[in-house]
């Protein structure tokens, strides 16, 4: 309990200056219900941020909206929330972009070699710029949904293993590695000589304990919040292979039932607080890194030169990966243009 409270304090302190909209609406006789689905556990930084957002919206709406947050995959794993939104089974979700690639292939552009090992500011330039806007439009069109604002950072994904130490890229060869979804992660796993596996996050702890796979691709925050050291994780190779982003989505059916004032509350609360939310996620990742080390997980960081060399080696296959992942030439061009402009 003490650990969870300590981790939560990192996030809440980073959000201490969050904005609350001045706009409030009169209470409705029967509030509209908003069900939000997350697959991560309650102590995860995403859950803490979204819990704060929902409470702020609910307060500003003056009783017109009642929010319910379903955590730990109680309703759906993130891989299924796109379909759930389309079918009206939930009103809101904040999935990782990788969870949407089965419906929106372009959402997998983070896995392209050109973004491998990139810094946070570079990723923000891309997701806040034209590439991110193009994908957001597709999400809205294909899911029948509304993306309410800029995307929420998760952080850098790395390699983690149970029994085999990870001292270099070569140590990944032959390992069976779980990923969170999308053709790009599977391709990169194979490029490293490992065997890809896709398992929903709520099932990972048991699968690790049973030896279903030898390791996984995830973040320090996810390792810490789920306490995966209890499932056997002992080693990490921090190559910052891609920077995860969550997409805040509200179903279009629910959105259209909102008054203009309520729609404004949804977007303004997110817009006014996204920088603090991103800062809180970064703080959570930093603390999570210390936690996983304190739990005996050995972290190895490849050199900048090794990461750049690996990126260059993968770039030779970028066109093939884009075709395999069904990422459109328009997204690849927009991504290259955004990076060249920087």
Where are these regions (language model features)?
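N-terminal secretory/targeting leader peptides
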Residues: 2-5, 9-24, 28-125, 137-342
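Basic, amphipathic alpha-helical recognition segments used for DNA target recognition
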Residues: 131-133
């Amino acid at each position: 309990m003490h650990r969870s409270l300590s981790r939560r304090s990192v996030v809440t302190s980073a959000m201490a200056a969050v904005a609350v909209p001045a706009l409030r609406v009169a209470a409705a006789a029967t509030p509209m219900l908003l069900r939000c689905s997350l697959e991560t556990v309650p102590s995860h930084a995403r859950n803490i941020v979204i819990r704060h957002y929902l409470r702020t919206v609910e307060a500003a709406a003056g009783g017109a909206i009642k929010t319910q947050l379903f955590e730990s995959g109680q309703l759906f794993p993130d891989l299924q929330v796109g379909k759930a939104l389309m079918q009206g089974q939930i009103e809101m979700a904040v999935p990782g972009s990788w969870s949407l690639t089965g419906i929106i292939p372009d959402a997998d552009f983070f896995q392209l070699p050109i973004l491998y090992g990139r810094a946070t500011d570079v990723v923000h330039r891309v997701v806040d710029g034209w590439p991110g806007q193009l994908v957001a439009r597709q999400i809205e069109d294909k899911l029948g949904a509304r993306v309410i604002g800029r995307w929420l950072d998760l952080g850098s994904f790395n390699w983690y293993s149970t029994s085999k130490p990870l001292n270099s890229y070569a140590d990944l060869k032959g390992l069976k590695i779980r990923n969170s979804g999308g053709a790009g992660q599977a391709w990169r796993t194979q490029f490293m000589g490992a065997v890809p596996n896709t398992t929903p996050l709520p099932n990972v702890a048991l699968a690790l304990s049973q030896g279903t796979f030898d390791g996984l691709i995830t973040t320090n925050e996810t390792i810490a919040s789920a306490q995966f050291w209890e499932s056997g994780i002992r080693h990490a190779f921090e190559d910052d292979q891609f920077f995860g982003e969550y997409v805040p989505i509200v179903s279009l059916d629910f959105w259209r039932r909102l008054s203009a004032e309520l729609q404004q509350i949804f977007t303004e609360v997110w817009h006014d607080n996204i920088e603090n939310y991103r800062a809180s996620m970064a703080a959570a990742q930093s603390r999570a890194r210390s936690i996983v080390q304190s739990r005996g997980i050995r972290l190895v960081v490849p050199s900048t030169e090794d990461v750049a060399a690996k990126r260059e080696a993968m770039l030779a296959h970028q066109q093939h990966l884009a075709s395999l992942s069904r990422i459109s030439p328009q997204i690849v061009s927009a991504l290259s243009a955004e990076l060249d402009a920087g």
